[in-house]
């Protein structure tokens, strides 16, 4: 099965159905790639056509008996971390790899998946030469390598020219997640200095592997799957189904389906696909918080966006990670509140039991909270490390001053000792020299210990 073509076609049909179901008028507006730099950015802070700078206002589809409420997302004036996003397979261009034009399908998915993260971070999203819906993603091939190298070029540009030592979160979905995973494996995981700034990754739908029952040791040597609320430096990844994935499911299993990494396909007897539950790792109770932009359901709105196009649907879906028959997946079910007649947003765009297409937006609210918790934990740790470093460096300065004074005292006493004539005076001076040398040795050991602690903390400080 050509996963790229199949997923892309299902996505287009499903979105058309969903748009019709809610009677949302939309049409396609042309867009061209900007020029003048090595990277074409579809989202970049301060850029005139930054697609992630649009409205994030909206309200809920409330549960039965409750009133609609504003979603309440706002943008921080100076977010402490960045997000780097790679979009999923969307290009409908004829060749195996897309050019860098900002085509409507790409603009639509960038708004749907990435824009809301601007409530947590500065979002950078490069255009890249992704494998198109007409390309082949069944295995690693030339087209996949072209796409990855293009995405990698954007990431290197971001690190070199925009990161400025800040913490960063990697975001992706499907093909975008697979390229994010390779960026982690080949760049982040291998560079301790970069791992210090790695706040986390959100990369659903890409079959990232770990040893069965473990958090680390598969595709990545150092970066683990997230397992605790507020944990940073880890990966959120999952594949969503509402039933046991079949033996030929493209996601959730390693013996079949999506695998476009240079590494050999792992042995499913020893390894499994990561499943991290976003509805628990956000500190919640297992219920999803979907977020959907209704202006961009079908395409790019011809008349521009409305003021408040986002809709949430709390307490409609519940999820849990499950293992069965070689699959490891995020199992979706309905909460089933009495009298709940709200639209089943996920089923409208799913492919049977496979919820790959909507799995980011179905958990968008949870993912935003996870990103915020990771950012908060990272910043708190960095602030604590910086404060501790300041304290230790002050102690080091005091220690050096004490040692210098002690040495002066020893030199002065030694000179006196050389000139002393009486035995009693010489013995007293010797005792004082010996005592000061002991104190100097203690101070030197304290300085050595302080330097070691400072070095350890500096290695943890971004």
Stretch-by-stretch model annotation:
Residues 2-18:
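Bacterial N-terminal signal peptides that target proteins for export
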Residues 16-27:
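Bacterial N-terminal signal peptides
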Residues 25-37:
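C-terminal region of N-terminal signal peptides and the immediate post-cleavage residues
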Residues 34-71:
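N-terminal module-boundary/linker segments of secreted carbohydrate-active enzymes
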Residues 39, 45-48, 76-79, 85-167, ...:
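Active-site catalytic motif of lipid deacylating hydrolases and related acyltransferases
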Residues 150-164, 185-347, 354-359, 364, ...:
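Surface cap/lid and interfacial helix-loop subdomains adjacent to catalytic sites
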Residues 172-176, 180:
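Gly/Ala-rich beta-loop-alpha elbow adjacent to hydrolase catalytic centers
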Residues 385-462:
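Extended amphipathic alpha-helical heptad-repeat regions
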